[in-house]
């Protein structure tokens, strides 16, 4: 299994895999010493252990709790926005700045070419998404994927540019939330997010939004209004993180597992509620185990939906998008 970071629920699997690797090393040693009898016994033991490993892997990843999916969504080796852009598209040209204050590195975006050779599909699209870092230095540079007002204003500028040139918009969402600092509030964080919701609802080109990791609160919905909303199988999308919910309701972070269950924040939950449209299947073990395969799956789904959305008139797109989001939730008059 790829990756060096081991989550707590993965430890039994990694221990078995380590034992399996030790046996394979012993087998190679037996082969050099030409001890055929020992080698045959090791072959049988390895085959049995491989079956146990496969069974345990399926047992773990096919029965993940909501909190465990939150942990996978935060896996530090999981593909981020730029990873998907470079794996799914070509000729990406990053565009910077909101033309008001500065360039927010927590959100990246630009034009790219989305192609599928099998079907002959080829389309220039505007790619926009949250970007996290891989280590402390890059996370500080990217502000841990927490966008400031200028990040959302940059995203809106790029969406308007895409609308001007009649190009579809694809947003990739992966954030623990919008940056909550005083300076962000002073520069109009709430207004910037609200403005994006208003403008995205009536943008005249197709919009597809994909939650690829964390989808926390207004930070996520700020680039999350689309004709189609996808969620990666092991991502989460909620008004609040399980830890914050736990600290509010129980005055402690120790109840984050219960909070995750109560929030119903997984892709399966949100598909049942009609909040999202499709789930992007992940390789067994998470997107980080086979990032190229994950990107290929997502690309196929994007192409399929873009074919449908690009055949619709602009007024139909806007009307259906507004109706889609207006129909969410339950209320009493």
From Swiss-Prot:
Catalytic reactions of this protein: N(6)-carboxybiotinyl-L-lysyl-[protein] + acetyl-CoA = N(6)-biotinyl-L-lysyl-[protein] + malonyl-CoA
Source domain of life: Bacteria
GO terms, biological process: fatty acid biosynthetic process; malonyl-CoA biosynthetic process
GO cellular component, one term: acetyl-CoA carboxylase complex
GO molecular function, one term: acetyl-CoA carboxylase activity
SUPFAM superfamilies to which the protein is assigned, alphabetical: ClpP/crotonase
Pfam families: ACCA
Residue span, CoA carboxyltransferase C-terminal domain: 48-308
Metabolic or biological pathway, per its Swiss-Prot or TrEMBL entry: Lipid metabolism; malonyl-CoA biosynthesis; malonyl-CoA from acetyl-CoA: step 1/1
Keywords: ATP-binding, Cytoplasm, Fatty acid biosynthesis, Fatty acid metabolism, Lipid biosynthesis, Lipid metabolism, Nucleotide-binding, Transferase
Cellular localization per UniProt: Cytoplasm
EC number: 2.1.3.15
NCBIfam families named among the record's database cross-references: accA (TIGR00513), AccA_sub (NF041504), PRK05724.1 (NF004344)
Protein purpose: Component of the acetyl coenzyme A carboxylase (ACC) complex. First, biotin carboxylase catalyzes the carboxylation of biotin on its carrier protein (BCCP) and then the CO(2) group is transferred by the carboxyltransferase to acetyl-CoA to form malonyl-CoA.
Family: Belongs to the AccA family.
Subunit and partners: Acetyl-CoA carboxylase is a heterohexamer composed of biotin carboxyl carrier protein (AccB), biotin carboxylase (AccC) and two subunits each of ACCase subunit alpha (AccA) and ACCase subunit beta (AccD).
Protein name per UniProt: Acetyl-coenzyme A carboxylase carboxyl transferase subunit alpha
Organism annotation: Chlorobium limicola (strain DSM 245 / NBRC 103803 / 6330)
Classification lineage: Bacteria, Pseudomonadati, Chlorobiota, Chlorobiia, Chlorobiales
